[in-house]
């Protein structure tokens, strides 16, 4: 991992601009809008043989920080920025310069050198944002809860964060989330309400909604989130993005403030399938078994060392064709809401259009009408409430030293007596969940009964795949558009099936609602589709997702508006800008400091 010790001693007394002989460029040299891993690397490779003129990692990171500084005040997606991101970029620049020179200071063959560099560091200089329930050693983990804002930073990076850093990524900071990852509105006592960049009257999905809104707004190339029921897929759907909820156990969940042992996962959110695959390579490339998350013991040998990008290259940049010839899709009819209204009709139209595209590309689409596939009924098997208290208690007690005054248990975190009245936020819809979680545990008889029912559900899903010889199941992530600010909850989502069975899911953009320039929705509201595969079949799943992505360019970026000024991507930033979350924009429907009706 790149740290300050990686730099030569002379770096301590000279600025990076003195070393490479460049200064603040007169014109912007890198625009972060819709940047991908490959586009960042192409920009860095241009003029690489000339230290005086080549693009630097610091300039790339500066461009993204400028994007955040300019547009985050409107959508409120960021909780905190990492003050070390620019110095890490400087380290990467110095490392690159050293790697390109031989003992006689003669530049090596550029293409071969760059290939070696990206092989060693596949995320070289890629800006990444993390959901604020994922540990980084230099930033507090708050999960959006004001009561945890004073907690000391964790002693270590989460394994997924360490993997990203070792691969050359630059961690820019932490994103807002629905507090404690318990809903999908992305409102929190510390971070306030995050707005959907496509329609600021709506929520960005959640609970990883800050990550989704940030990646959609080009605040980073990649985002990292978690998913307990919908939380990676909902923000991807609501923001026109791609996400991967991996098979439970494929990626270690250690170093993540938990909700559910049964249902939690960690995964990426990106603007293209390729970036999902690269990040998955990185996050699965370390220790094969993590004793801090014994679910990783489930990993089968055949997925060890897989290169998830290997089968994707042929589909990049090509639109149309019959790339899905013979692929069998099962369309879950029970996950559709056929009501004709302004919230559901756009979703149904987008799914109908997507099915037509799949068939035109040679796919076979089979309607699944089994009554078992009913999201509302399946939600009755959710086991979060049984596991939440014990998992949060263990995390908080393992995180904080004796001197810390931060809450050490779930009960103290939600104490209306011990805490200030604005130290936590529970939306009224969640009051019964919190009250139940405070007294429930995995020792409850009903917990065992639900686990048996989950096992039966998992077998039934496998039976559906086998009996119809399906490759994947598809359905809208949400049966309606993402809800408006102030809504009771993020209703209509279909993520519970994969959350309980542990099956992998890739979410892809499926379409948009109608544009409405008079209501300030110039791009329409995004609609996403889930593609579910069999356990450990991420390679197949990503390949199919890439072929769907290649059928037609669906993703359209939001049209961003700055609150104060537009970004200057050519300016020189000496220090990371300050970000202050807007805690005053919380809707009156969500009172602070309460979890029950008094």
Task: List PLM regions with ranges.
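An extended, acidic, His-containing surface patch that forms the Zn2+-binding/catalytic region
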Residues: 451-455, 459, 463-500
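Structural helix-boundary/capping segments
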Residues: 70, 166, 217-333, 352, ...
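Loop/turn elements at helix/coil->beta-strand transitions in domains of secreted/extracellular proteins
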Residues: 54-58, 74, 119, 124-126, ...
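Acyltransferase
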Residues: 61, 90, 345-370, 391-403, ...
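An N-terminal boundary/leader segment
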Residues: 1-97, 104-108, 333, 337, ...
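Short helix-loop capping/hinge segments that flank enzyme active sites or metal/cofactor-binding pockets
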Residues: 124-146, 323-336, 385-462, 509-528
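Immediate post-signal peptide segment of exported/extracytoplasmic ligand-binding proteins
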Residues: 92-127, 275, 316-332
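Short glycine/serine-rich loop/turn segments
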Residues: 120-266, 292-299, 332-334, 473-489
